[in-house]
Amino acid sequence: MFKHLNLSKKVLAAGLASLVLASSATFAQTKSVAVTAIVEHPSLNAVKDGVYEVLQEAGYKEGENLRWQFQSAQGNTSTAAQIARKFVGDQPDVIIAISTPSAQSVLANTKTIPVIFSAVTDPVAAKLTQSWDGSGTNVTGVSDMLELDKQVDLILRIVPNAKTIGMVYNPAEANSVAVVKSMEAELAKRGMKLLTAAAPRSVDVSTAGRSLAGKVDVFYTNTDNNVVAAYEAMAKVAQDSQTPLIASDPPSVSRGAVAALGVDYTELGRQAGRIAIRIMEGEKPGDIPVQTGEKMSLHVNPSAAEKQGITLSEELIKEATEVIK
């Protein structure tokens, strides 16, 4: 009898030991990914979704071996700073910061936790990194920088006689400041000029747009987060003033822009997700060069064009990756 009891105890002990080891292994394999964005709008949401897709495809399952958390700053930089401090306190394996303001907030609070930015136009101008070739620090990421000559080419295909381009932007957003400077230089090469109006908050977008109405031949929007968050207001200004609105991010075409040639933001997120996996598997963020969007797409909206007083050419519509109807 005692032999049987001793044997049972040994079996039970072995079973418990196996359970503890299995639990420890699961815990050790669990990775924590914290994601933040300055605001929620279609382009930034697509980045977030792309990150999540890639992690799932790689076998990182939320609730099993992945701790996933997402927080939006709802357009408030003070909230972005609070989220950054909270995430740093959580000590995740990786923080993914979507947009320049979110990335700046996170990097102001940690020099050790790996940080991956996405939907950032010029990370050097935004002082996130000193080099596109590898920061040597705790940051890397994926830029949505576009070749502005191709953006101007698109503008002129849609409005051939355009001379003055209008841009509404947030002067506190480094991305937008960089685009404004580059766009001014690109337009000057072609004998064109840029007029701008400031929208420090999303609620200022409509007023800023109306201040340009009648003075510009085309409205052009970059991925300024205040403008994109209030894109329907910008589209209404374009419609009311009969001024074509051309975007740099394809998701804005379904919200009222007549066309956009830009990066695929879901793919931009997938690129960031693949970088996150590399880091979680042991690579250092500072050794990974900054990437740019790998996939471009042209979206057009003939209905929006008609409402804004123009007709898109059949040739352009045929070239489009997606036609919004």
Listing of model-derived features with the role each one plays in the protein:
Residues F2-L16, F27-K325:
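Short hydrophobic alpha-helices and adjacent helix-cap/hinge residues
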Residues S23-A25:
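N-terminal signal peptide c-region/cleavage motif recognized by signal peptidases
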